[in-house]
Every structure is written in structure tokens, then in C-alpha cells.
């Protein structure tokens, strides 16, 4: 069955905070959790929805941006032992903006 939802959310936040120095070195300024994990509605099979605020000077462009995001996504998924979905801030889709304003829990 796995740990209770609040324990899973706390573990996700703890893990993200432990990665802060590494992520900041990669150009990540802030990370927030949103979606089912933030709402406490996740299951052990749920992915983790993360919103990343990136330092523009650290972010590659073109195809290298895709490689950069893929590397971040794989690193985060490995650390969290769960699939990860990433939204890059600022969110442009209205429904994402709304979800983030309602649900986002900052990790750092």
C-alpha cells in the first residue's frame, strides 16, 4: 500500500530540498510541487508534477534545451523513484497557471 499521502508529499519535498545545490548549479532557481501530490490525492503509481523556474542565463537554446530538460527530468525521476512531469515557468496555459496558483508547494 505504501506510506500515507502526506508522508509521500513530505518525502518528495525533502528529496527536492536535498537536491537544491545540484539543481541550482544546473540553473534551476526554484522548484514547486503541484498536482495530485500537492493536493494529497496521489497514489503510489502517481507521477510527480513539478514547476521549475530556470535562470535564463543557464538555459541552453534549441535542441540543447530539450536535452537539458530531459536530463533534469531523468535526474529528478531517479531521485524521487517516480515518474516526473515538468512545467517550465512561467506557465503559459491558463489551466496550468490556475493549478499552480492554487496548489503549488515550494520546495525551494
What feature does the model see in each segment?
Residues 1-30, 38-40, 44, 57-108:
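Catalytic core of pol beta-like nucleotidyltransferases
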Residues 53-55:
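Residue-level recognition of strand-loop junctions within catalytic nucleotide-signaling folds
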Amino acid at each position: 500500500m505504501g506510506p500515507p499521502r502526506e508522508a509521500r508529499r513530505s518525502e518528495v519535498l525533502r528529496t527536492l530540498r536535498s537536491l537544491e545545490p545540484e539543481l541550482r548549479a544546473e540553473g534551476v532557481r526554484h522548484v514547486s510541487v503541484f498536482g495530485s501530490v500537492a493536493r494529497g490525492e496521489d497514489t503510489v503509481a502517481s507521477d510527480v508534477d513539478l514547476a521549475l523556474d530556470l535562470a535564463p542565463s543557464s538555459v541552453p537554446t534549441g535542441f540543447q534545451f530539450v536535452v537539458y530538460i530531459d536530463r533534469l527530468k531523468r535526474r529528478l525521476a531517479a531521485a524521487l523513484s517516480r515518474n516526473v512531469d515538468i512545467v517550465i515557468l512561467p506557465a503559459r496555459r491558463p489551466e496550468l497557471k490556475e493549478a499552480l496558483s492554487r496548489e503549488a508547494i515550494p520546495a525551494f
